[in-house]
Amino acid sequence: YRQHKNPVFDFVQRRGRERHNRDASAIEREDVRAKLKVLRAGRAIWYAPDQDYGRKQSLFVPLFGIQAATVTATTKFARLGRAKVVPFTQERLADGSGYRLVIHPPLEDFPGESEEADCLRINQWVEEAVSALPEQYLWAHRRFKTRPVGEPGLYKKRRKR
């Protein structure tokens, strides 16, 4: 969880999340100990493994044939938290009435032998999910923003307003 700069929006977002899950708690994204404590208690945490969080805690592995900075946190949380990785997808319903949530089986034999193999496996899973419903993916997210050293950027520079 990252607090919003706008305190009113932050309040509205937190209230909305807590309304649907009284046991939900927003854990600051840097608070690894709190996340591990939750996992070891048999509860769940959520984060998006398909986001570009930069190179600090990432490895470059292919996603749709392009090297992508992929977080190693999935492996670390599964190992240190003694937790299963349970992927899910959500689909906006055509009539705009809501979403269909699909909770998939836990990844078997995860974590594996190496963080790199695990990152590749996560990206392959993301590829399959996105390919099934490409119109549902958040393509506006600059997934390939962080490039391997020496590789040029893939996005046009944004103009400052």
What are these model-predicted stretches?
Residues 30-161:
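Non-catalytic C-terminal accessory region of glycerolipid acyltransferases
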Residues 1-43, 54:
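Conserved nucleotide-cofactor-binding alpha/beta core module
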